[in-house]
């Protein structure tokens, strides 16, 4: 037993519950201009606006891409959807000031609703990477709002945005070909999760880290960049995916995704799937996979152990387990099962892997497997090389265990 204890190198990695800082989530404060009543009557209507004819004669373009999910749009009431479509078009075409329809005003909307609707447009459209916020002008007659002008704020010119959009399309087209459009929805989600983690470094100082440019053009980002890139790729692969905003239990702002696989909803957190990002000291461990699958297609119950869902769009209750990574890959345990565990180690060996991860259904199962494999060191019965050093990591909140062989 003493010899065995010497070669059993246990590394308990502290799971860092960190997310993006609160300043990393897009939150723009608009400007409000209320004109006095005497100026209202002299303002041109949409029909009289002299810029309307110029706009019609100018060749239009749009950076909006087809095929994406409109999950946030579908959460809105009918009057809100009217403004959504107008703001969506304005941002997609990088227009200047546009007049919002007055019908929603008659139905009870006001300038305070613009922020929610703007956020919904941004949630649904990761390809609007060049917009940083908006301003609006409110026209009032007495206490009544009679008109609102909306203008997007952009950090790029039209020409710059078009060039970047084309660069992103070319790069992601190669990624999509590599993934394969004929795969199942689960396989697409898993492949995107892995591709983004392999191709991206977590870097708080990465340029454009609030949008997809950081991932696809720079290879470095933070949580919102990871999440929007995940959404962009899955939308192009025909998988419903939307952005989720909230916090982690340290209180820091964070962003991740909601996906639909075979008709059921699941949460996916690509940022937290980056194992190196989750390390306490940011260092890599020999033999440990770069990918942590604890956050690939998880339930609401699972995600709420570490995340808090906020934002303007209500999320569905996710209860399905069929597309959970551990269930799908056969690494989900309801009790200690020697035959199942042996199959997992044998399969890993055949693929040339030196690590395995398993997930437990509940605390009872988790404690039992920890006792047998770690306390009683039964883990060595699955490793043929008696000279191996085995390291392990525990995620008590997600009830998962990772074991890997090192040469130390």
Describe these PLM feature segments.
Residues 225-298:
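Hydrophobic/aromatic-rich core segments of domains that either
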Residues 160-215:
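Secondary-structure boundary elements
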Residues 212-226:
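A short, highly charged nucleic-acid-interacting micro-segment common to nuclease
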Residues 85-87, 159, 217-221, 245:
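Alpha-helix capping and helix-loop boundary segments enriched in small/acidic/polar residues
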Residues 2-25:
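Sec-dependent N-terminal signal peptides of Gram-positive bacterial secreted proteins and lipoproteins
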Residues 19-182, 299-408:
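N-terminal accessory/pre-domain segments preceding catalytic cores
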Residues 146-150, 214, 218, 264-270:
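Short, well-ordered strand-loop elements centered on a beta-strand within folded domains, enriched
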